[in-house]
């Protein structure tokens, strides 16, 4: 029961995220799972079976055979073609890089290391995206809510996302406009408060995926010691097409030679025995498959990196994306295509309100939740921007700010007085309820005095301006 709970707890780390694309999932989800499966398969054969079997002289007792096989497995073997005489090879000629076989013991650990490297960029993206003001993972999850088929739930979720995104985008814009430096010493940490933080971090994650796949191809060639071909997979396919067997190619040889010594009384006997590497039957198939899978990953990562670089770096693609969604919305201003006013409004909406991160989040929502939900969200954000833009002159003036503060304070004081007054109301018998709720003389005088004070404050503000 405990093992099942542990497995279910680990399953969430193997599940896909909602803030990525198809190329990311190939890198951080599918590839590590494939590598883990291969690592477990090889481990079962190594530690649960006989990965190597050697041929010994008849005089060897059973204990010697077990010792020799364990020794040859833990030490390096070397490859010799069937036509060569082992006795004619010098010791330094036997363990040259072209002949020495030292990788097969480490295959499970090498595969686990590769899985960790493929998974690492996703953790980097998860960490930094959670430290930004926009919770993109939660935004996409809310957009993908299956309950959005109901109109009320859909409108509620759009309202929640609009408020969250508007608040986060407004905060980022204020930080950049006021040039607030939260971190005085390490200034580059202030980058997380910029309006392009998530976009650049995601693009950096794409670069890491690309570099990782390229590095894994190189490390595989280095690990297997394939010096004859710089591109291992193509070399193996070429040998197979040309009909060259493993006895001459040396790639994952089934048979190898092992040298070991046995101490007998005062003498040391040296033996060279031929061993069958059964494990290489699995290794050959696994690494050929992985090599071509990595080539596919390299191509997909390149395409995805170029695609996101173009749409994030060049503003014209952001404006085109938003304009297409606004054209699909119910807004009357965008029924006419290619109008100058429409282009101007979209340009201001993208550059002054959404910025780079806002468009990036909308792209993720459109990719995961569909174009219909994304269009409704774009429309809601544009309506919020349009309302803010129309009231910018009134809200941004010093007079209106002070007047708004005074009005708010006056309304608050009136509400407080009404609350105190309500506690003193006496319901008199024989009088209508409306008569008993009328304010008394003291309240009228207090209210008039407060109104006179508010008018004086407004006059002082206007005079100072």
Curated annotation (Swiss-Prot):
Sequence similarity: Belongs to the pannexin family.
Any Gene Ontology biological process: monoatomic ion transmembrane transport
Highest taxon above the source species: Eukaryota
Cellular component annotations (GO), alphabetically ordered: gap junction; plasma membrane
Recorded topology in the membrane: Multi-pass membrane protein
Protein's recorded name: Innexin-11
Main location: membrane
Primary gene name: inx-11
InterPro entries found in the cross-reference section: Innexin
Taxonomic source organism: Caenorhabditis elegans
Pfam families, per database record: Innexin (PF00876)
One Gene Ontology term of the molecular function aspect: gap junction channel activity
Residue intervals passing through the bilayer: 29-49, 105-125, 195-215, 286-306
Subcellular localization: Cell membrane; Cell junction, Gap junction
Disulfide bridge positions per record: none
Keyword Transport among UniProt keywords: yes
Region annotation Disordered: where it falls in the sequence: 433-465
Primary role: Structural component of the gap junctions.
Alphabetic keyword roster: Cell junction, Cell membrane, Gap junction, Ion channel, Ion transport, Membrane, Transmembrane, Transmembrane helix, Transport
């Amino acid at each position: 029961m405990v093992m099942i709970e542990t497995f279910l707890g680990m399953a969430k780390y193997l599940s896909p995220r909602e803030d990525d694309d198809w190329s990311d999932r190939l890198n951080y989800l599918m590839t590590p799972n494939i590598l883990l499966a291969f690592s477990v398969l090889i481990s079962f054969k190594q530690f649960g079976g006989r990965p190597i079997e050697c041929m010994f002289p008849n005089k060897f007792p059973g204990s010697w055979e077990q010792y020799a096989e364990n020794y040859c497995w833990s030490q390096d073997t070397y490859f010799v073609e069937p036509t060569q005489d082992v006795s004619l090879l010098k010791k330094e000629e036997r363990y040259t890089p072209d002949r020495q076989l030292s990788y097969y013991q480490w295959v499970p650990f090498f595969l686990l290391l590769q899985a960790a490297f493929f998974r690492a960029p996703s953790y980097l993206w998860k960490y930094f995206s959670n430290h930004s003001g926009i919770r993109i993972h939660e935004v996409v999850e809310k957009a993908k809510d299956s309950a959005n088929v109901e109109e009320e739930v859909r409108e509620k979720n759009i309202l929640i996302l609009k408020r969250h995104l508007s608040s986060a985008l407004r905060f980022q814009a204020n930080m950049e406009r006021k040039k607030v430096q939260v971190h005085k010493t390490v200034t580059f940490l202030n980058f997380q408060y910029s309006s392009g933080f998530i976009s650049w971090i995601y693009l950096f994650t794409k670069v890491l995926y690309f570099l990782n796949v390229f590095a894994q191809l190189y490390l595989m060639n280095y690990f297997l010691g394939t010096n004859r071909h710089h591109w291992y997979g193509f070399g193996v396919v070429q040998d197979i097409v040309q009909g060259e067997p493993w006895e001459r190619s040396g790639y994952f040889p089934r048979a190898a030679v092992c040298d070991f010594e046995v101490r007998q009384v005062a003498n040391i006997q040296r033996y060279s025995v031929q061993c069958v590497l059964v494990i290489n039957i699995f290794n050959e198939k696994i690494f050929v498959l992985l090599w071509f899978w990595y080539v596919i990953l390299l191509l997909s990562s390149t395409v995805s990196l170029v695609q996101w670089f173009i749409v994030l770096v060049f503003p014209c693609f952001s404006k085109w994306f938003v304009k297409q969604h606004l054209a699909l919305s119910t807004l009357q201003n965008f029924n006419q295509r290619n109008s100058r006013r429409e282009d101007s409004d979209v340009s201001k909406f993208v550059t002054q309100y959404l910025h780079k991160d806002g468009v990036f989040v909308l792209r993720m929502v459109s990719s995961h939740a569909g174009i219909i939900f994304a269009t409704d969200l774009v429309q809601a954000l544009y309506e919020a921007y349009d309302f803010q833009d129309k009231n910018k002159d009134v809200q941004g003036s010093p007079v209106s700010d002070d007047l708004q503060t005074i009005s708010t304070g006056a309304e608050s004081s009136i509400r407080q007085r009404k609350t105190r007054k309500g506690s003193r109301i006496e319901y008199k018998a024989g009088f209508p309820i409306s008569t008993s709720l009328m304010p008394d003389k003291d309240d009228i005088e207090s209210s008039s005095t407060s109104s006179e004070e508010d008018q004086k404050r407004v006059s002082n503000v206007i005079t100072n301006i």
